[in-house]
UniProtKB/Swiss-Prot annotation:
It catalyses: UDP-N-acetyl-alpha-D-muramate + L-alanine + ATP = UDP-N-acetyl-alpha-D-muramoyl-L-alanine + ADP + phosphate + H(+). Transmembrane segments: none annotated. This is UDP-N-acetylmuramate--L-alanine ligase. The keyword ATP-binding applies. It comes from Acinetobacter baumannii (strain AB307-0294). Pathway: Cell wall biogenesis; peptidoglycan biosynthesis. Pfam families: Mur_ligase (PF01225), Mur_ligase_C (PF02875), Mur_ligase_M (PF08245).
Length: 482
């Protein structure tokens, strides 16, 4: 047996202790991106899993196909015989299942606390940051898999290569996204952590204080053991600011020369990016990632930092990047549709913060320099639209044609001056692009597509709300242009 094979086998076949007295776990809001993955992993560990959601979806259908009982609608009787309830921050305290659990003295835990339990007896790797978590988590998972380390993973989007966002592996490794939106990532105690960047988002959680947000990231990194590892983006000014307070082993990555891991000679080739990675004590390594944009090169560097430290070979890293098929709704090509003498290419992306939208626009420009860029954008949350209003005006003015959906509330009440009509008016006053408001309920989507789209356009559907479903609808109906 080779040393590599022996080492790999030593990292596998870990027996994970079960949670005492817990047999039946019920998830309130099981259809959520963060909830369904944990539910599936626990089901595969042998727990009885049930859950409820406000409406049926592809996710709830998939869960039922995998043997998980899903109730549509929230009722007290749904939690019968459950030993614990798992809830997300989106669940109202007045939810009948939550109230019933309180009355019956059934423990109620937050999603991240249950994720922390999954991580407790494994070698946990948590990926945090305002942007890029899902892609970075997926890249690292793919690298570990290429080294035959078979990790458990819980990701916030569908990994295109497997068609799922979570799976139970046989090794001691677990890779998971760490959610800062409600500060619940403080429940996690990983062995290694990535922080991709720190930006002002979800500020209601932090009482509007950016300093509190940064302090919370410091707390998160302090959850690492003193022998753990933090891999952080050294190009990010806010990360550099907190580094003196981290007090844990740190590796920095980025494009700047003072980083421990950096990318040089970056080239864009359509939907692919080529770069050379420099690491201390190693030969330069030329790599290709099957994704466009400098932000994805940074995501790759983060994953490379942890993978290298965990003993993943350069060959496995190279294979993982070259074969990476992406994550659902992350610059996902929906198809090309004939129009006149050319075609329109439809791409769907989940990014909803101004910096994410800007990175997507840059990737679109770099990968499709000869196409006119038409963006169908749906702002996500009134609070984010309010807090990032000026940034949205600047970023959305960078496209050639802007189509605006109304704000997706995500449970929030409307805020005066933070709606799409006001945003459109401000963008119009800037004078770079003429926004068009779309109301699918009124049925003007079809007419606007027919009047706006031109041969060889790139149509980018952008946002975290139901704009993804609208993108699917557009693809199914040939963009309404045929």
């Amino acid at each position: 047996m080779s040393p590599t094979t022996a080492a790999n086998q030593a990292k596998k076949l870990i027996k994970v202790p079960e949670m005492r007295r817990i047999k039946h776990i019920h998830f309130v809001g099981i259809g959520g991106a963060g909830m369904c993955g944990i539910a599936e992993v626990l089901a595969n560990q042998g727990y009885k899993i049930s859950g409820s959601d406000i409406k049926a979806s592809k996710t709830t259908q998939q869960l039922e196909e995998n043997g998980i009982k899903v109730y549509i609608g929230h009722e007290a009787e749904n939690i019968k015989n459950a030993n614990v309830l798992v809830v997300s921050t989106a669940i109202d305290p007045e939810n009948p299942e939550v109230k019933a659990a309180i009355e019956q003295r059934i423990p109620i835990v937050r999603r991240a606390e249950m994720l922390g339990e999954l991580m407790r007896y494994r070698h946990g790797i948590a990926v945090a940051g305002t942007h890029g978590k899902t892609t970075t988590t997926s890249l690292l998972t793919t690298m570990l898999a290429e080294e035959n380390l078979d990790p458990t993973y819980v990701i916030g989007g569908l990994l295109n290569s497997t068609g799922v966002n979570a799976a139970l592996g046989e090794s001691r490794f677990i890779v998971a996204e760490a959610d800062e939106s409600d500060a619940s990532f403080l429940y996690l105690q990983p062995m290694a952590a990535i922080v991709t960047n720190i930006d002002a988002d979800h500020m209601d959680t932090y009482e509007g204080s950016f300093d509190k947000l940064k302090d919370t990231f410091v707390q998160f990194l302090h959850n690492l053991p003193f022998y753990g590892l933090a891999v952080v983006c050294g190009d990010d000014a806010n990360i550099r600011e907190i580094l003196p307070r981290v007090g844990r082993p740190v590796i920095t990555y980025g494009f700047n020369e003072d980083n421990d891991i950096r990318a040089i000679d970056v080239e864009q080739d359509g939907m692919r990016s080529h770069f050379t990675v420099l690491r201390k004590g190693r030969e330069p390594l030329r790599l290709t990632i099957n994704q466009p944009g400098l932000h994805n090169v940074l995501n790759a560097l983060a994953a490379i930092g942890v993978a290298t430290d965990e003993g993943v070979s350069d060959e496995a890293i190279s294979r993982a990047l070259k074969g990476f098929s992406g994550v659902g709704r992350r610059f996902q090509v929906q198809g090309e549709f004939e129009l006149g003498e050319g075609n329109v290419k439809l791409v769907d992306d989940y990014g909803h913060h101004p910096k994410e939208v800007e990175a997507t626009i840059k990737a679109a420009r770099q990968s499709h320099p000869d196409r006119r860029l038409v963006m169908l954008f749906q702002p996500h949350r009134y609070s984010r639209t309010r807090d990032c209003f000026d940034d949205f005006i600047e970023v959305l003015s960078q496209v050639d044609q802007l189509l605006l959906l109304e704000v997706y509330p995500a449970g929030e009440k409307p805020i005066v001056g933070a709606d799409s009509r006001t945003l459109a008016r401000s963008i119009r006053l800037r004078g770079q692009v003429e926004p068009i408001l779309i109301d699918p309920v009124e049925g003007n989507l079809q007419n606007i597509m027919q009047n706006v789209l031109q041969p060889n356009d790139l149509l980018l559907t952008q946002g975290a709300g139901n704009v993804g479903a609208i993108s699917v609808e557009l693809a199914q109906h040939h963009l309404y242009v045929k």
